């Protein structure tokens, strides 16, 4: 399938993409957290931020920026530490709000939803490993002799985004269903938020120690 567009072993790629999307990460956790705390609207706004951020990174990977980042340690470290700092900021904010017994979002609906989208977008964009991953993964399924490899890259990128959309939609709908139950269980909600905050701190530590 799509062999005429320079895509190799598409079905193998699709299986690999599904497994990759299922691996827990900060983006997935952020979407799930907001679907529980802010409902389906908050969850899908977070997902939109992730989708746009990933699309930008995929385009940059195709444009050759990934090679620049890989061969320029200073640039890689700048993006890496910015991402780690932002993850630490999100985790600390969640933990602080949980300990104080407050909601980590503001009371105003519009600023809250706008902030969710912006945080998800920044979270997605400040991950230098993602852009390097897209190149190393996609290149295995692209025929370098194809006349238009950009089309091949677009097909693979779109497939990954669709798989991600399906999985995140499942998380958002599931999170929305348990929202009412969580809100009636104060202690359970506090424990859940604390674990989410700690996981973000853990993701920050892991990103800060990664090498290009």
From Swiss-Prot:
Pfam families given in the database record: LysE
GO molecular function: antiporter activity; L-leucine transmembrane transporter activity
Catalytic reaction annotation: L-leucine(in) + H(+)(out) = L-leucine(out) + H(+)(in)
Record-annotated membrane-spanning stretches: 12-32, 49-69, 71-91, 122-142, 153-173, 188-208
Primary location: membrane
GO CC annotations on file: plasma membrane
Coiled coil: none
Membrane topology of this protein: Multi-pass membrane protein
GO biological process: L-leucine transport
Keyword line: Amino-acid transport, Antiport, Cell inner membrane, Cell membrane, Membrane, Transmembrane, Transmembrane helix, Transport
Protein origin, superkingdom: Bacteria
Compartments where found: Cell inner membrane
Keyword Transferase: no
NCBIfam families for this protein: PRK10958.1 (NF008201)
Protein function: Exporter of leucine.
Family, per entry: Belongs to the Rht family.
Protein name per Swiss-Prot or TrEMBL: Leucine efflux protein
